[in-house]
């Protein structure tokens, strides 16, 4: 090679479209807990765990526990007048090896127990939680994120008890925590990300943030309201 010689380099980029399956309540029976469980069982048998699954749920109430298995999930609620997609039992998300779940537009109404039991990265948006012992918990290898959600009258609203996670989402924006025993309980949480509660409101909770793990938390742009006398 001499000075002034030109070297040409090239790369080949291969983009593969990832297949996904989508179910709409207008086309697929999912009006009852039994129908939804039957659908989930068929998905586990027939759909690869590498295939994302998107569910558009009707505005009905599902009683009993529901388990979403090892997939990337998009689970979307709906409304019809005063009716909203609602779960009254524990919803478990069990994605493995990087599979995660997104849930949006759903109400979780309980009188004890756990609302969302996450074993994978779980992203909650525009959801409501009322009446649970623990509204949403991140178990080991999991992370729970919430944005634009309401947590009312739960013993614990958000709980973290995870020593590792396949994904993180540290922005907890525009949530409302009202009348909970503990709004946010951090027992164990991996990583160094700062949990940002900008735009979130804490009102009339016995404890706003119980940070046992001493994880970094930013509440500078959160709102803290006390009960009026």
What are these regions (language model features)?
Residues 62-68, 84-93, 97, 110-118, ...:
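Short glycine/acidic-rich loop motifs that flank beta-strands on beta-rich extracellular proteins
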Residues 20-56:
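Acidic Gly/Asp/Thr-rich repetitive segments characteristic of extracellular carbohydrate-active
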Residues 5-17:
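C-terminal edge beta-strand
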Residues 74-77, 100-104, 122-126, 143-147, ...:
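All-beta strand scaffolds that present successive hydrophobic residues in beta-strands
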Residues 18-22, 33, 38, 202-205, ...:
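Extracellular/surface-exposed low-complexity segments
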Residues 28, 34, 73-115, 126:
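Right-handed parallel beta-helix/beta-spiral solenoid domain characteristic of secreted/periplasmic
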Residues 1-3:
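A short beta-strand micro-motif common to beta-rich folds, especially ectodomain repeats
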């Amino acid at each position: 090679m001499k000075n002034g010689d030109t070297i040409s380099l090239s790369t080949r980029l291969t983009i593969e479209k990832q297949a996904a399956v989508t179910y709409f309540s207008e086309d697929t029976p999912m009006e009852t807990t039994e129908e939804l469980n039957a659908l989930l069982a068929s998905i586990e048998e027939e759909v690869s765990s590498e295939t994302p699954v998107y569910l558009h749920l009707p505005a009905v109430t599902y009683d009993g526990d529901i388990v979403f298995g090892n997939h990337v999930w998009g689970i979307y609620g709906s409304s019809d007048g005063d009716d909203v997609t609602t779960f009254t039992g524990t919803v478990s998300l069990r994605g493995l090896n990087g599979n995660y779940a997104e849930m949006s537009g759903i109400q979780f109404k309980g009188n004890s127990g756990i609302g969302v039991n996450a074993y994978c990265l779980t992203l909650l948006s525009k959801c409501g939680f009322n009446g649970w012992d623990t509204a949403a918990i991140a178990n080991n290898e999991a992370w729970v994120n919430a944005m634009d959600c309401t947590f009312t009258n739960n013993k614990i609203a958000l709980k973290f008890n995870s020593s590792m996670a396949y994904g993180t989402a540290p922005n907890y924006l525009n949530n409302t925590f009202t009348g909970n025993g503990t709004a946010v309980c951090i027992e164990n949480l991996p990583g160094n990300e700062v949990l940002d509660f900008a735009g979130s409101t804490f009102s009339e909770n016995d404890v706003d943030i119980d940070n046992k793990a001493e994880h970094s938390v930013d509440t500078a742009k959160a709102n803290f309201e006390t009960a009026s006398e």
